[in-house]
């Protein structure tokens, strides 16, 4: 088995069972293409999401080190910060979140609703900053201060996107390969590409388990020239830790994130409304709405390798719908 080294890494069981992989019949009829969805939005803690896969590995490492505090960073409406805080609460750990307002809004819903509201329910210690210009350094500075107060902090990077955290999506590739055994001729997998860990983990796993399947990352914050090196760096780091080679090219589409990270756009919001009205599935304005817009346009523009079925990775994010009202 090519991924057998994965079992060497301690893993905290947070999800419990494979997330569903479902066929979307009404969307498929609408688009004229078989569309499947991997429901990582329904992982079991705090309204779900993909970051729990990363936290299974990262928090296991934190506990191994004897940490009593998890420190991480993100936007005010970060899904990653929300899930990290929830896991900390579940385990009786302290959580400190370094937050920025990346869109510079004064809208009350964005500042207080959605994921931000949930952070208060989890008793998260909030530290605001003007901008996460160098998040690794900023997190380390914060950790030093927290440690001086008598805590034992463990730093979790933005998005949980380290090589260790991304092992969660190598693990996900195993699930996908097994669940797709009955999907005839799967052509492509589409995922939002942001902090890059989810994309890179899938890239390593799928290269070795489903080498004929095309993986497309739809960027949500950066142009290809800036995003591709981030994905490749993590891809190679993951492969190195698993004693594998990673030679698959990284495919990115950057046509769908404008005007910028965290700012809704028309195509993304149309995708959110379409999935809700056709399938009762909730996407979000920041990640999955834009990724689905890429999938829809990719079919229209014939950007995929062939006409086979497409699998969409639903990474979660529905709490942001409340924060972005009245945009939705």
Swiss-Prot record:
Its EC number is 4.4.1.15. It catalyses: D-cysteine + H2O = hydrogen sulfide + pyruvate + NH4(+) + H(+). One of its GO terms (molecular function) is D-cysteine desulfhydrase activity. It is an enzyme of class 4 (lyase). InterPro entries: ACCD_DCysDesulf, D-Cys_desShydrase, D_Cys_desulphydr_bac, TrpB-like_PALP, TrpB-like_PALP_sf. Keywords: Lyase, Pyridoxal phosphate. Its cofactor is pyridoxal 5'-phosphate. One of its GO terms (biological process) is D-amino acid metabolic process. The modification N6-(pyridoxal phosphate)lysine is found at residue 51. It comes from the Bacteria. Belongs to the ACC deaminase/D-cysteine desulfhydrase family. PANTHER family: 1-AMINOCYCLOPROPANE-1-CARBOXYLATE DEAMINASE-RELATED. Homodimer. Catalyzes the alpha,beta-elimination reaction of D-cysteine and of several D-cysteine derivatives. It could be a defense mechanism against D-cysteine. NCBIfam families: ACC_deam_rel, PRK03910.1-1, PRK03910.1-3, PRK03910.1-5. This is D-cysteine desulfhydrase. It comes from Salmonella schwarzengrund (strain CVM19633). The gene is dcyD.
